Structure formats: structure tokens, C-alpha cells
């Protein structure tokens, strides 16, 4: 059996309205243009962004919702739909650490559960040096209720 590495990452942001969907769709389109099979995913129960993903990728975008589903089910969904893809792009929701009960159901929780590297999208409009501590905080922040993802 051939084992191949696939590119996979999660697109997150410090808040909603930062451009996650625009960046996600742009990366999906670029990778498809380069001949890759891209599997889209979306954190949470969102059904609008998944329609955009599906239109670009011509594959169903799958919701990864750790609030409504068990960690095991989310892992199973990810593994099932990632099969056969060259790249998996997961779009986060809201702010990276925003969820139901602090971080429960957050993009950070999904990234930790699936061991996905995170690409952080920051809207730096009307800012300059102030973006640096924002980025630093996102890198160094530890969830207030860490979970065991084993």
C-alpha cells in the first residue's frame, strides 16, 4: 500500500470578518488550478461557507463540529474525506479560540484534535506595529481548558 503525504492545514483568524473565507477559497482555487485534488472542511455547523467550498472544489465540504459531535466522529469524518485528496483545507470559524464554552468547538480545538498546522489570517487594516503583539498572543496563548486529544 502506498503511503503519501498530503498537505493539510487550518485557516484561522483572531475574529470573524478577517478574510478566512476569501483566503480559503483562493487557496483552494490555486491548488486546483495546479492540478491537485482539494478536500475542503469547515469548523462548526456553518452551511454557507461549505457551499462556497463545494463550488470551488467540486467536492462536498465537510463540517467538523466538536460541539455537536464526538472527537472520535470528527476524526473519522476527516480521515474518510481526506482519503484520495492531495490537500485538505479546513476553514475555521469566528476567532481561533472562540467556541461554545470558551474554546469548546473552536477552530483551535479542531486544529489540536486533528494535529493541523494553522495559517492565521489577520485583518491589519488601520494597523502597523500593533499587529505584532496580536500575532504573538495567538502564538503563545494556551487554552484555558486544555483537552487530551489522544
For each feature predicted by the language model, list its residue ranges.
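ATP-dependent carboxylate-amine ligase catalytic core
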Residues: 2-18, 22, 28-114, 122-139
Amino acid at each position: 500500500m502506498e503511503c503519501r503525504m498530503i498537505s493539510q492545514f487550518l485557516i484561522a483568524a483572531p475574529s470573524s470578518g478577517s478574510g478566512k473565507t476569501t483566503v480559503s477559497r483562493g487557496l483552494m482555487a490555486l491548488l486546483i488550478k495546479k492540478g491537485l485534488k482539494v478536500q475542503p472542511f469547515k469548523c462548526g455547523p456553518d452551511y454557507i461557507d461549505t457551499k462556497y467550498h463545494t463550488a470551488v472544489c467540486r467536492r462536498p465540504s465537510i463540517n467538523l463540529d466538536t460541539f455537536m459531535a464526538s472527537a472520535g466522529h470528527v476524526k473519522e469524518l476527516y480521515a474518510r474525506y481526506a482519503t484520495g485528496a492531495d490537500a485538505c483545507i479546513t476553514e475555521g470559524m469566528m476567532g481561533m479560540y472562540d467556541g461554545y464554552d470558551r474554546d469548546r468547538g473552536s477552530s483551535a480545538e479542531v486544529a489540536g484534535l486533528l494535529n493541523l498546522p494553522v495559517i492565521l489570517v489577520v485583518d491589519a487594516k488601520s494597523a502597523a506595529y500593533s499587529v505584532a503583539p496580536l500575532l504573538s498572543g495567538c502564538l503563545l496563548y494556551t487554552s484555558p481548558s486544555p483537552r487530551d486529544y489522544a
